[in-house]
Amino acid sequence: MKNKIFYLGLVLILAITGCSNSNEKELIESDEVSGSSSIGLIDDERILSAESEPGNWLAFGRTYDARRFSPLKQINKESVSDLGLVWSKDMGTNRALEATPIVVDGIMFFTSTWSRVYAVEALTGETIWSFDPKVPGEWAKKACCDIVNRGVAVYNGKVYSASLDGRLFALNAETGEKIWEVDTIIDRERSYTITGAPRVAKGKVYIGNGGAEYGVRGYVTAYDSESGDQEWRFFTVPGNPDLGFEDPAMEMAAKTWKGTDWWEFGGGGTVWNSIVYDADFNNIYLGVGNGSPWTREIRSPGGGDNLFLSSIVAVDADTGVYKWHYQTTPEDNWDYTAVQDMALADMEIDGEMKKVLLQAPKNGFFYVIDRTNGKVLRAHPFAAVTWATHVDLETGRPVENPEVDYSDNGAWVLPGPLGAHNWQAMSIDLDSGLAYIPTQENPFFYAVQEDYKKTGIFKWTPGKWNMGIEMSSLAQNILNNLDSQPKPGGFLKAFDPLTGETKWSVPIPHYWNGGVLGTAGGLVFQGDALGMFSAYDKDTGERLWEFNTYTSMLAPPITFEVEGEQYVSILTGSGGGDLFGGEPLPPIEIQALSLIQI
């Protein structure tokens, strides 16, 4: 009998693009309450023991280790051909969905555009409740890369979400009612935004922000998960030294900024994506973003590494006190953020078991870092890299390539500002020792802003992009240098972070594709920009199954199990950084798939 694809239900949720008010009638009012919940009962111990209940997806990266690899294997190489659509849910928007759903005890929690939050039945997609934070529509102009949101945290009967305009909410997981709300933004004269998912651990909620291009100063704040009271705040770049320093780490960092009043430009260093809790060392790892402006000769003309830009910073989970850092791109000059997903693992390196942190950031090198002290152990390129020749493991520093120095005449550089790997999630498979990475090679023609070169004065414009890069003549610069442009492309790669070997690589027609999920069923799932959701053989890269969603994908898939049956789910629809490509954005859905009974 021929396999069937069938719909169990389609729910329409209406919205008006360009403003935040939803036409959908909320099932739950958002008055502040203090009621308890009987669902969403996730605590530290449950996440730490997540391997004992693989049917749930309890945290942003599935576990605190954030490897995004599932032990479920009912859907495997032999059975994946029977995978078919169970339900889809129209989210009523033509903008990107980027969230990682949390699934616990048959209920799925996720976010949509404008920071709206949903709880749905995982088996049917039926809405249980929804919450709209009613972000002012004009806030869209403050967001660098669309009105997106990457998800929620669920903890002790509450759902934690952050809004584009910088508020943090605790919602009753059973009803969606608001329990508390706090304003996380320190200066509303600056264009701060939040698109990232909160993280939870040790009775705290951790959240960062975005807006580096607009001239903000980055920081991460920890709030008490029950009351919403602020527990600590860690700034990632120093402020005005004349006003004193918040802590010794900022005093240390200020010595690496030279020659200008950098604090007037904000400095950047926003933590807009990756925050990881490490129970082994009671650390919180912060993935820190780019400088404001991008160009170092404007930002810090006297030189210096500009800490903690483009760094992984370890702080104490209870106090926020600095422990160590590793800077992936000292003196960042290219928008090479280190906000990309981080994963934790125990790996044998040089004959010794090491507790390591793994990251494949924008700059194109895959870092294996000792979690005890921040020392880099491996740093192999996982994509085409021209800005540096290699990373010196003795010094821990990259060796820059002078042939692509763009300070005088401009130059094509790989990676470009979208990075060799961006926020789209990778998956770490410890059994094979491989990382499955959504990789891209998208060159950019960098040149210093012409007005600055002529006058020596950088005109910072509040509320606008302040990169220090020549953009007004970018198109002409590209046309003038087409002959030397490196070829762009997208790839799904299986990469060995210890040896630097690419085991297999699958080319994908577009470079801006979705996140990745690996499973013990021998599969790697990914959605791509052309609408194809695919399952690959994790050993060879062979495509074993595909499903046309008819809309682009950026979000990472997840998998879960309900009543003994495994499902795969993905939020579909493109946007975010892809808006710069001017591509049409079709309607957006969330979809759930399972093995079809025939």
Which residues make up each language-model segment?
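Short, conserved, GDST-rich strand-edge loop motifs in beta-rich repeat architectures
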Residues: 207-219, 259, 286-306, 441-485, ...
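Short loop/turn segments that connect beta-strands within beta-propeller blades
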Residues: 122-124, 172-175, 225-227, 317-319, ...
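Conserved small/polar residues in nucleotide/adenosyl-binding loops
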Residues: 596-598
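C-terminal motif of bacterial Sec signal peptides marking the signal peptidase cleavage site
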Residues: 15-18
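Repeat-blade elements of multi-bladed beta-propeller folds
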Residues: 57-61, 96-116, 141-167, 193-214, ...
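Extracytoplasmic beta-rich repeat domains
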Residues: 89-100, 130-153, 181-197, 235-274, ...
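Blade/loop signatures of beta-propeller domains
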Residues: 27-85, 241-250, 397-400, 480-482, ...
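N-terminal cofactor/phosphate-binding cores enriched in small/glycine residues
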Residues: 66-185, 518-519
